[in-house]
């Protein structure tokens, strides 16, 4: 068994930790955070002012995540007062936040489907998808949970 030194940023101290199950990162409290590689994938389409969003989250491990939150930011104004799925809420005029639910280590969560009306009939929209919260886990590969997708108003589905 080997030991590794974990430097706690901002604390000016180091904590000794057993490397045990593999790599982990330090939180601000000096506690070793679990490592989980959360990723989001799905499809987007836009046609006649209706924006269709499908997002599925998965965890490449090695640790499970009790819950995570994915943020969807839209470049176009959305009609106010639209109803969202039970696992989602409005985070602003152009932002929707959705819970993923539990993500097992090396497992996939459910898919969330959202139909949104835009103000007017835009020619295109840009949608940014990213993880806002992952239960405090360290994610050494955040690139697979951050996407910026151009969605032309063709009715075609654009995968991310």
At which residue positions do the language-model features occur?
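Short, low-complexity, Pro/Ser/Thr/Gly-rich segments in the mature regions of secreted, periplasmic
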Residues: 148-160
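Serine/threonine-enriched low-complexity regions used as flexible
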Residues: 53-55, 119-148
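A surface/secretory-pathway sequence property marking extracellular, secreted
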Residues: 67-97, 102, 146, 159
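Secretory targeting and sorting signals
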Residues: 1-19
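Low-complexity, acidic Ser/Thr/Pro/Gly-rich terminal tails and inter-domain linkers that flank the onset
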Residues: 18-48, 79, 158-160
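Low-complexity, intrinsically disordered segments enriched in Ser/Thr together with acidic residues
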Residues: 102-125
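Short solvent-exposed strand-capping/beta-turn motif centered on an Asx-Ser/Thr pair
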Residues: 58-64, 75-77, 119-121
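Short beta-strand elements of extracellular/lumenal beta-sandwich folds
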Residues: 39-66
